[in-house]
Regions:
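Fe(II)/2-oxoglutarate oxygenase catalytic core
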Residues: 1-65, 72, 78-87, 92-97
């Protein structure tokens, strides 16, 4: 996956496991790092959770989908209400050239 993202250097990789809640809970906006780099949000399962951005866009959690954006763009996640959990990898990288 890192090759497909044109990664030169990994800044940080973190796994998030969000447990099922009775209703989807939207989390606050944040940035993953203070380093100006590229963020890759990679979904390991499909559920009704999502990643949302300040401009109002929402990306549905679909297994094997990756969302790629500048690390300085605030974003937030959510829980899931229709699966046992929501599993996401947050990968921060410097890209080649």
């Amino acid at each position: 996956m890192l090759e497909k993202c044109n990664a030169k250097h990994v800044v940080k990789i973190k796994a998030n496991l969000l447990l099922k809640t009775s209703e989807v809970i939207e989390h606050c906006f944040h940035t993953d790092t203070n380093v100006d780099c590229t963020t890759v949000v990679y979904y390991l399962n499909t559920c009704d959770g999502f990643t949302h951005f300040e401009n109002g866009s929402k990306i549905e959690t679909v297994e094997n989908r990756a969302v790629i954006f500048n690390s300085q763009i605030p974003h937030g996640g959510s829980t899931t209400s229709n699966a046992d959990n929501r599993v996401v990898l947050n990968i921060n990288i410097h890209t080649k050239s």
